[in-house]
A protein has these predicted regions:
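Catalytic cores of RNA-modifying enzymes
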Residues: 1-220, 257, 262-279
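Long, well-ordered amphipathic alpha-helical subdomains in the mid-to-C-terminal portions
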Residues: 190-193, 200, 210-250
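Interdomain hinge/lid region at the active-site interface
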Residues: 253
């Protein structure tokens, strides 16, 4: 179906994509963030991150382009697609590959298999919940393409404008590596914004075992990212707890946006010590 990745150009891949869409009468659906990869250099970069004979979960099969090349290298590819029309296309495109299992369904709702890698061009509108699910399922490695703005949030450090809940929760579980920026021209149809490819490797030890506590604490804190810790703690946990963390030399005058991961975990542990309920 597709030529060798080393011998195909972006124009070739675009033409193949257009022909497949025309053949099956499929129009890309903006609602589902359907932008199909047409850049062989991007595909090669993704393939280079995945060891041979890996077991892979792909979120968003599309017409099966990336799936096809992953199948040539992987031991097994589970690929999830919510759009029934694209399931029909991908089933035909990938019919000769016995190591590919196509699953029709919502990636947020179905059970995931145990895999070595997750690979996906993550739809913008479900990026955050998908990453949370990755963490909860213990996905050890991932290569994801996300909108540049989301990528900056994932990589952001304390004190920066992009720093927030998603930064903290993801960095608690994963070491995140920036691979490369990807322009709109690498997809069809071209999205309005650039993307970025990130590689995520599971930390040997998460910053905290109970992810729910981290979710609850960051939810409280980042409702008021520009307020002081003193103000937030007093409002939600009371003055007695405020006095306790002050006695522990916790910097209560710092702004929420400046709290690094270690400080947030410390605050959670103080809550546990004092039996403070995180709502």
């Amino acid at each position: 179906m597709f030529p060798e990745i080393e011998k195909i150009s972006r124009r070739d891949l675009l033409n193949i994509t257009l022909n497949v869409l025309k053949k099956y009468g499929v129009k890309p659906r903006e609602k589902l963030s359907q932008n199909f990869i047409i850049d062989p250099e991007v595909i090669k970069l993704i393939l280079d991150q995945v060891p041979r004979d890996s077991i892979i979960l792909e979120i968003g099969t599309g017409i099966g382009t990336l799936t096809y090349y992953l199948a040539l290298k992987a031991h097994k590819v589970y690929t999830v697609e919510i759009d029934r029309k694209l399931i029909r296309v991908a089933s035909d495109v990938l019919r000769d590959y016995k190591n590919v299992e196509i699953v029709q369904g919502d990636a947020l709702k179905i059970n995931w298999p145990e895999v070595d890698y997750l690979v996906s061009n993550l739809p913008y509108h479900i990026t955050s919940p998908l990453i949370i699910k990755m963490i909860k399922y213990g996905i050890p490695n991932a290569v994801i393409t996300v909108q540049l703005e989301v990528g900056e949030r994932l990589l952001a450090k304390a004190g920066s404008e992009s720093y927030g809940r998603l930064s903290i929760i993801t960095q608690c579980a994963y070491i995140i590596e920036r691979l490369r920026k990807v322009g709109p021209e690498s997809f069809y149809p071209s999205p309005e914004v650039s993307s970025i490819i990130l590689k995520l490797r599971c930390r040997e030890e998460k910053c905290i075992e109970d992810l729910e506590l981290l979710e609850k604490m960051t939810n409280i804190l980042f409702r008021h990212r520009n307020r002081s810790i003193k103000w937030v703690v007093s409002k939600y946990f009371g003055n007695e707890f405020l006095n306790y963390i002050t006695s522990k030399n916790f910097n209560v005058n710092a702004r929420v946006r400046d709290l690094d991961l270690e400080s947030i975990v410390k605050l959670i542990n103080y809550c546990i010590e004092c039996e403070v309920n995180l709502q």
